[in-house]
Design a protein with these regions (language model features):
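Bacterial N-terminal signal peptides that target proteins for export
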Residues: 2-14
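C-terminal motif of bacterial Sec signal peptides marking the signal peptidase cleavage site
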Residues: 21-24
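Conserved functional micro-motifs across diverse proteins
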Residues: 26-201
Length: 201
């Protein structure tokens, strides 16, 4: 039979993350931008350190049976801008492409908060977070307000996803969780991310 599953997935003092992240940003390497002038790009090792320190992993069991496994990353300002740097080096962006991507990212940071979710559910019929008729609900509580997520399934090639999220594997589904609240608000408070939905029990 089916029973509702409610998980308080992430309850984190986001401001504590920022202290670690900002220290990493202060020591960025100067890397030549391909097809353009030198710009201050984050190195791969610095980016991997940031994403590792802002990712939480958990397995949920019913007895000995695995119900789901997730890895979730808070895409705060340093990580989001770091992803632009990583893509610039990987895909050989010109300086104008780099500036356009950076501008788009900065605009999104003002409008919304994003998380990356790598989700594995053995019973695949429940892996439908992005469908209109899904039973799953995802909430972000921050600054005394609750926001509901829009879940978007990432359809990029596995290797492209792993370039930014090396912990993601081919057995899991990649999602972007988008909340209509500025990233700066989430960064400067304590946020709780809650996932509720159906699950076999």
């Amino acid at each position: 039979m089916n029973a509702p599953l409610k998980l308080a997935i992430v309850e984190m003092a986001v401001c504590a993350f920022v202290a670690v992240i900002l220290s990493g940003c202060a020591s960025r390497d100067l890397t030549p931008a391909p097809n353009g002038p030198r710009v201050d790009l984050m190195s791969q090792s610095q980016y991997l350190h940031l994403i590792e320190n802002n990712t939480q992993t958990k397995k949920v069991y019913d007895g000995f049976a695995l119900l789901l496994e997730y890895r979730i990353s808070f895409l705060n300002t340093p990580i989001s801008l770091g992803q632009v740097d990583m893509n610039t080096q990987l895909y050989q962006y010109s300086d104008s492409q780099y500036q356009n991507e950076k501008g788009t990212t900065q605009s999104n940071l003002v409008k919304q908060t994003e998380f990356f979710l790598s989700l594995y559910i053995p019973d695949g019929k429940y892996d439908d977070l992005a469908k209109k008729n899904t039973k799953w609900k995802i909430f972000l509580d921050v600054a005394g307000q609750r926001y509901e997520a829009k879940a978007v399934r990432i359809k990029a090639q596995l290797r492209d996803v792993q370039n930014l999220y090396p912990f993601h594997d081919r057995f899991s589904t990649a999602y972007k969780l988008i909340f209509p609240v500025s990233t700066s608000i989430t960064e400067n408070g304590v946020a709780k991310l809650t996932l509720t939905g159906p699950m076999t029990s």
